[in-house]
């Protein structure tokens, strides 16, 4: 029997990582925990990430408007980035096919085609898609209050890595919001400025009890296989 997959979608500051962690902590049954933050920080080699010297081969931040090189940035995938993201999605599928429940947080934009790739790679498996979407202003306030506390591989990224990362993320933020929330198909959408983490977990649990999610099936009707 396939394990249940829960995908928690939302941009930085939406509460997706906190929700995923609290959901697993609240359960007596067996749930694996993974997500885009784990993947980017601990699985993808730093030199191929969007702050690294070989980002063009992996996941690169490039100008949204080539005529404005100092403006908003967006993500672009190189060959290793495409292969890595496909693997990330296949891992979720492998967990389910082995009978494990898994909850993971994600940034489900359609360009690059994270949304389409995941929807098709998880075809035939039970997936519940949850989108956490607080207002833009709330997100910006939350992100502004965050401190850079991650241990950075300065031997790869350089001694001024923290400053460069903060600057790059600031320039990605507007694009992330538009790209991640462009898709309106979801099994459950929650405003985390209104509902706290415990309430969000309870709402996800209640939706699970209602039956299987249908959002990914709907997405496969909208988006061709990438």
Residue spans of the language-model regions?
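P-loop (Walker A) phosphate-binding loop of NTP-binding proteins
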Residues: 11
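Hydrophobic anchor at the beta1->P-loop junction of P-loop NTPases
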Residues: 8
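Walker A/P-loop
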Residues: 17
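ATP-binding Walker
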Residues: 14
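Conserved substrate/cofactor phosphate-moiety recognition/catalytic segment
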Residues: 21-83
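Glycine-rich phosphate-binding loop used to anchor ATP phosphates in small-molecule kinases
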Residues: 70-123
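Conserved phosphate-donor/acceptor-positioning beta-strand/loop module used by diverse small-molecule
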Residues: 123-146
């Amino acid at each position: 029997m396939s394990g249940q997959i829960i995908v928690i979608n939302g941009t930085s500051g939406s509460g997706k990582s906190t929700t995923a962690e609290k959901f697993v902590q609240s359960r007596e049954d067996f749930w694996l925990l993974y997500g885009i933050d784990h993947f980017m920080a601990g699985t993808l080699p730093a030199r191929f990430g969007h702050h690294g010297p070989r980002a063009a081969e992996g996941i690169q931040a490039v100008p949204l408007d080539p005529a404005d090189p100092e403006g908003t940035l967006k993500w672009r995938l190189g060959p290793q980035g495409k292969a890595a993201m496909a693997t990330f999605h296949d891992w979720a599928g492998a967990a389910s096919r082995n009978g494990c429940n898994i909850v993971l947080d994600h940034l489900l934009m359609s360009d690059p085609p994270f949304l389409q790739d995941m929807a098709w790679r998880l075809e035939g498996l039970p997936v519940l898609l949850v989108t956490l979407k607080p207002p833009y202003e709330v997100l910006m306030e939350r992100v502004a209050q965050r401190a850079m506390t991650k241990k950075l591989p300065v031997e790869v990224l350089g001694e001024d890595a923290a400053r460069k990362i903060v600057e790059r993320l600031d320039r990605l933020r507007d694009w992330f919001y538009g790209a991640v929330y462009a898709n309106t198909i979801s099994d459950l959408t929650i405003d985390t400025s209104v509902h706290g983490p415990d309430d969000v977990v309870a709402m996800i649990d209640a939706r699970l009890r209602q039956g299987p999610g249908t959002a990914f099936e709907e997405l496969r009707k909208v988006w061709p296989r990438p």
